[in-house]
Swiss-Prot record:
Heme b b566 binds at residues 97, 196. Keywords: Electron transport, Heme, Iron, Membrane, Metal-binding, Mitochondrion, Mitochondrion inner membrane, Respiratory chain, Transmembrane, Transmembrane helix, Transport, Ubiquinone. This is Cytochrome b. PROSITE patterns: CYTB_CTER, CYTB_NTER. Heme b b562 binds at residues 83, 182.
Amino acid sequence: MTNIRKNHPLMKIMNSSFIDLPAPSNISSWWNFGSLLGACLALQIITGLFLAMHYTADTTTAFSSVTHICRDVNYGWVIRYLHANGASMFFLCLFIHIGRGLYYGSFTLSETWNVGIILLFTVMATAFMGYVLPWGQMSFWGATVITNLLSAIPYIGTNLVEWIWGGFSVDKATLTRFFAFHFILPFIIAALVMVHLLFLHETGSNNPLGTSSDSDKIPFHPYYTIKDLLGLVLLALLAMTLVLFSPDLLGDPDNYTPANPLSTPPHIKPEWYFLFAYAILRSIPNKLGGVLALVFSILILAIIPMLHTAKQRSMTFRPLSQYMFWILTADLFILTWIGGQPVEYPLITIGQMASILYFSLILIVMPMVGLIENNMLKW
């Protein structure tokens, strides 16, 4: 009898991707985050679908429809907070996943890496538009400030902003289109994930040593399915602790005030996962310069393969590069902290220094350290 798992047109794709997939025998728990991101995406799509059943994308009723979900819908509060904190879990896993790629040199798989960068931009756009939907004060003013950045683009900026707004200010048309995009983008993300995996399975996974693992592979199931399951349980524990004990910990109290175009909140700031980029944006006094720095702070990931000077792929045996990597990590924590602080001395200076350090480390210091390590190893 032929094995249906290996011969059925649909099942053999699943089989070759998640069951009989040859995987390196030494990949650590840092490789868990890909599957956790898949779980986060599934959670966001499911909870989002249930929220969309009760939400109305209209400026007059959006805020009260979210209130209605929390108060009147059966377990609506759980669905709403799972969705809100699920986004935080998503970005936490994303940042660790990217950090793992940088540390172990996974960016040398260029197609997978580039699709990953497109995925990052798409997820950020989706999260930004989702934050606008409850139509609280921070939703409205966040949308106004961030979309207004496009007006810095020469010649077409103002027209572009009004085109996105669907009028002369953030209003009903803006909310409706943001809801439409927020609904469709996760499915586009799911399609991009398939492309990401397609390219990954063309080359095979990297491993902590950064060497070829062709001579030593093990099947993905049961070894890595059970390992991923442990990661999933731990992530679920963290997510449910947040949702059930402190659901508003990562949110902004201002978003519990309905949007009012006539009253500006004292400090306009995005969710925690955008704060590092927001700090870089604010550290440059010029509007266009700030926007370019903001975009380049993420787009810089695309040129990292070109900046890789070391002869070794991974940082496992490169202690100097490890120091630089952890300094970069600490710098990102500082930028995240600064992004949530008011614009005043000495915080402005700290933000500017941290922004300079961020770009210097990636563009100058780390490539130089790679060359120094080559020299030390007489390579």
